[in-house]
């Protein structure tokens, strides 16, 4: 939902990775918070970026190819993060040189391991595959992500934005600042 919120305001994060996601506690019900907006940018609906920003193992192929890109690069990063969470390793080997990681990201197919895939539902892999499309126009949109059957199975996916009026904890802290 955080990416939906950002994208609905025209904000592209451009550096989504596990290090930039904070869990509010260690339970399965923990809220997730996005951090580090240093590379983020506000763009219009049809606007494209050209700056080569992001962390190599999580950056979309179009960024590595110096092509204009849009908010869909954040969705590629979500696909990489999801792959990492399911498999325990990055899809494009981070043990190689940076040049080799970039080449793999742009040219190689996603290396799905059938043994690992058998541990999860087919919907999980369809979800990951929809995010890790090399061509941005084939990649899932944020609306497709939120409507995906695997995501809809999750117990806790809030369907509305939070603000100081709807979130008592947030409201408490912001009211002290006013």
Can you say where each PLM-predicted feature lies in the sequence?
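Conserved catalytic-loop aspartate of Hanks-type protein kinases
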Residues: 74
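Conserved activation segment of eukaryotic-like protein kinases, specifically the C-terminal portion
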Residues: 50-62
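Catalytic-loop of the protein kinase fold
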Residues: 7-24
